Design a protein with these regions (language model features):
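Electropositive polyanion-binding surfaces
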Residues: 4, 8-355, 359-365, 374-381
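Short, compositionally biased
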Residues: 383-385
Length: 385
């Protein structure tokens, strides 16, 4: 099973999830199902009033999930737009606990932004499938409950990295390097009447993004996507010593591993194996060469999985629109170059190429387009004016 997990990765498509683990493990024995005891790794840490994370501890434990909650219902409750979820109300003390966690999560988030973390907002519509048919594309908006979990996971990943470092263990870090194409980001800022420093500076970029979100919220998702592409992809890298400067530019952190999803991602499972060895005073179960090879392999596996997921999202959008040839849509130009002009329509949220009527258009222009053609297999959507 170990070799199978190494060559697989969890892949999420509109119609089916392909888990890294066999289904009995992924959805049952390793899943935090309600009212079931599970063996787990617990990461404990203290968060100061200013959102600073103090290094914590790791330990093995038996945990129990007392309520199965959904992001959307918890988000509505936290925002004051919905009643308390029934499962939460029935679990003694849980509502107060989640209120406290929400407050702490916001402090963690604010601290990261002050340190230069990037607050991006890209549009990746999720296909809604009913009876095997794509019936809708839904843009998942920012969700306070989901952000709560993300904030605690980011903090836990940092604590885990520093814990293993203190134990003199090598680690596979999650790295987004300082952008090599920073000059392109400078040019992008100038086109919007802004300035960025000559050298990469995540705090300056974060402040630029905040200003642009406030100035032009409609076009901000497209700006976010352009920034993501220019930042470059994330990768897994073997880190042997604290002196290594590799960090996560987008999160504005230096010490960062993936550790919170060992039943979905192989790098997280490797981190757990390292942590368990450190906890029991054993040597690393991997040599540095093995970890280096695994880091390269896991990066390639992740890239392959993401490529499949992107293609499936494009095909799902093309399939949904395939019955609407000739219909007109309101949209915005997201790309304009000699290679082609691209338009993002608002409803349903989808992007395609403008194959006719491209003259005098520039990025950010509002347009009304007609759907001319779709190719489901290729994931192509063609518009014209």
């Amino acid at each position: 099973m170990g070799s199978e997990m190494c060559i697989r990765d969890s892949v999420y498509t509109p119609t089916r999830v392909f888990p890294m683990l066999p289904e009995r493990l992924s959805t049952n024995l390793t899943s935090l199902n309600p009212e079931q005891d599970r063996i787990a790794m617990v990461i404990s840490y203290t968060v100061g009033p200013d959102g600073t994370v103090e290094d914590g501890t790791m330990r093995r434990a038996r945990v129990r999930n007392y309520a199965k909650l959904a992001y959307n219902s918890v988000d509505a409750w936290l925002e004051g737009n919905g009643s308390i979820p029934q499962a939460m109300a029935e679990a003694e003390g849980m509502a107060d606990q989640i209120r406290t966690q929400d407050e702490v999560a916001q402090r963690l988030r604010q601290r990261r932004f002050e340190d230069g973390a990037l607050d991006l907002e890209t549009i990746e519509p999720r296909a809604i499938v009913e009876d095997g048919r794509v019936v809708q594309l839904r843009h998942e908006k920012k969700n306070r409950a989901r952000a709560l979990i993300e904030d605690f996971m980011i903090a836990a990943n940092g604590v885990t990295a520093r814990y293993l470092e203190a134990k003199k263990f090598p680690t596979i870090r999650r790295v987004v390097r300082s952008p090599e194409r920073w000059d392109r980001l400078e040019t992008l800022a100038k086109q919007l009447g802004e300035r960025l420093p000559i050298e990469p500076d995540s705090k300056a970029l974060s402040e630029f993004l905040l200003r642009r979100r406030q100035a032009d919220p409609l076009r901000f998702p497209d700006l976010s996507l352009a920034v993501v592409k220019l930042l470059g992809r994330g990768e897994y890298v073997l880190i042997r010593t604290h002196d290594d400067e590799a960090g996560h530019f987008g999160l504005a952190v230096k010490d960062y591993v993936h550790s919170t999803a060992p039943n979905r991602r192989y790098p997280d499972l490797i981190t757990h194996r390292l942590a368990k060895a450190a906890l029991t005073g054993r040597q690393s179960p991997y040599s540095n060469k093995e970890l280096e090879d695994l880091a390269t392999h896991c990066t390639a596996q992740e890239d392959a999985a993401e490529k499949v997921e992107r293609q499936m999202r494009k095909s799902a959008a093309a399939l949904l629109l395939s019955t609407r040839i000739g219909d007109h849509f309101e949209g915005i130009v997201t790309g304009a170059s000699p290679k082609g002009t691209w338009v993002r329509i608002f409803d349903p949220p989808a992007e395609g190429r403008l194959v006719r009527g491209t003259s005098d258009l520039d990025v950010g222009d509002r347009v009304r387009v007609r759907l001319a053609h779709t190719d489901v297999e290729q994931g192509f959507i063609d518009f014209e004016r």
